[in-house]
């Protein structure tokens, strides 16, 4: 089961580019996080509420596949969707340039539900209201 794509626009800042005048590769992972954070806010389970409830979602795997560079002042669209939401959570990403719809990067991150002691938890049991909000987001989209 996967959700629809959640989209957010971002303009490439000068500080995100390198000596080759393209976006430094690590910034794409930062943009993945921006997309993920905003998507979680839209599920009704924003990171702030998760953390206040003692639930953390650390990244345990990250992959990015580079297709074309982004450059200073490009307007990009960060697309994020949730594709797994059980013991592990998987988010998929696409970053495209708005002007020509060119795919710049795609990838994914995998996360684990853990408590403050970094011990794995079952979200369905630990926080059923949060689990149901995420499940509802998946099924309605």
Predicted features and spans:
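Solvent-exposed strand-loop boundary residues in beta-sheet-rich modules
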Residues: 99-101, 117
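Hydrophobic beta-strand positions
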Residues: 16, 95-96, 113
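Intrinsic-disorder/low-complexity, polar/charged segments enriched in Ser/Thr/Lys/Arg/Asp/Glu/Gln
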Residues: 2-9, 61, 75-77, 88-90, ...
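Ser/Thr-centric signal marking residues that sit
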Residues: 17, 80, 109
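Hot-dog-fold acyl-thioester-processing enzymes
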Residues: 2-59, 116-141
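A structural microfeature
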Residues: 105-107, 122
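Hydrophobic beta-sheet segments that form the core/acyl-binding groove
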Residues: 64-98
């Amino acid at each position: 089961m996967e959700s629809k794509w959640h989209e957010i626009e971002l303009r490439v800042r000068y500080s995100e580019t390198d000596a080759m005048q393209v976006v430094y590769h690590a910034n794409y992972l930062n943009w993945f996080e921006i997309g993920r954070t905003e998507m979680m806010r839209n599920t009704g389970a924003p990171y702030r509420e998760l953390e206040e409830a003692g639930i953390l979602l650390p990244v345990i795997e990250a992959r990015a596949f580079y297709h074309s560079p982004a450059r200073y002042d490009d307007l990009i669209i960060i697309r994020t969707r949730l594709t797994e939401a059980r013991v592990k959570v998987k988010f998929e990403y696409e970053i495209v340039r708005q002007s020509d719809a060119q795919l710049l990067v795609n990838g994914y991150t995998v996360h684990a539900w853990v408590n403050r002691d970094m011990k794995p938890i079952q979200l369905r049991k630990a926080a059923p209201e949060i689990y149901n909000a995420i499940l509802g987001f998946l099924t309605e989209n």
